[in-house]
């Protein structure tokens, strides 16, 4: 019974102190949901024209323009950060206090002698000496990450202002290791190249996720016991 209570206590402690993995919500931004979709206008070319609108016209713009059209996204993200800090503190203090002194200017010699004896008795001083306190600290942090790949996305909504809300994803399973990639965002049709590609730097409200699942990921993660100790360790 005591063993069961111990396991329950550890599980509750772990669930309460463990830090959840970062997550991304791929829900479209509010303005995308609130903005009406553009009405589809069917246009047909003149009979015999080389610039047709069929499935395989001789000359046509190959860029994505309509709902459910595909566009290739070239993801080329680089993030770098550098920060440094330095702090120096110094403090010095000292104090001295002398004993009291009594003076007498009267004609009585006996009183004068008594005053002198009293001054000799109280001629002491108090000194706290010098107190020095110093602190020096400095720190530097540098970080650089890059991620490059391509993924096809689909036009989910053509908004009233002509912009596209796109969504794409890819899952790859190789030798028990699963790679998952997903992205969403808003693009302008003018930023799509002639080869129907767009760079990720032109995507507004971009949300890009890439993660792996499998034994390799498990082997690089800390055990739950280590996570519990780190979450409650105060030092």
UniProtKB/Swiss-Prot annotation:
- Do you know which PANTHER family this protein is assigned to? FLAGELLAR L-RING PROTEIN
Name the principal localization, coarsely classed. Answer: membrane
One GO MF term on file is: cytoskeletal motor activity
Q: Per UniProt, what is the membrane topology?
A: Lipid-anchor
**Protein's name in the database:** Flagellar L-ring protein
What domain of life does the UniProt record list for this protein's source? Answer: Bacteria
Presence of the UniProt keyword Membrane in the record: yes
Q: Which organism is it from?
A: Wolinella succinogenes (strain ATCC 29543 / DSM 1740 / CCUG 13145 / JCM 31913 / LMG 7466 / NCTC 11488 / FDC 602W) (Vibrio succinogenes)
Q: What does this protein do?
A: Assembles around the rod to form the L-ring and probably protects the motor/basal body from shearing forces during rotation.
């Amino acid at each position: 019974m005591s063993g069961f209570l111990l396991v329950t206590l550890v599980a509750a402690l772990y669930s309460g102190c463990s830090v959840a993995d970062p997550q991304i919500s791929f829900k479209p931004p509010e303005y995308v949901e609130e903005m009406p979709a553009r009405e589809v206008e069917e246009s047909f070319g003149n009979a015999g024209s080389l610039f047709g609108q069929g499935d395989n016209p001789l000359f046509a713009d190959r860029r994505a323009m309509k709902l459910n059209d595909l566009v290739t996204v070239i993801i080329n993200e680089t993030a770098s950060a550098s920060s440094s800090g330095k702090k120096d503190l110094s403090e010095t203090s000292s104090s001295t206090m002398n004993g009291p002194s009594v003076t007498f200017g009267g004609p009585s010699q006996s009183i004068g002698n008594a005053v002198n004896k009293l001054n000799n008795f109280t001629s002491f001083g108090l000194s706290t000496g010098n107190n020095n306190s110093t602190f020096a600290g400095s720190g530097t942090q540098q970080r650089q990450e890059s991620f490059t790949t391509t993924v096809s996305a689909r036009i989910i909504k053509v908004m009233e202002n002509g912009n596209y809300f796109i969504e794409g994803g890819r899952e790859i399973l190789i030798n028990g290791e699963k790679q998952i990639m997903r992205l969403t965002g808003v693009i302008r049709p003018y930023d799509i190249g002639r080869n129907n590609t767009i760079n990720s730097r032109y995507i507004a409200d971009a949300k890009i996720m890439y993660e792996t699942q499998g034994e390799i990921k498990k082997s690089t993660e800390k055990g739950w016991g280590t996570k519990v100790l780190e979450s409650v360790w105060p030092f």
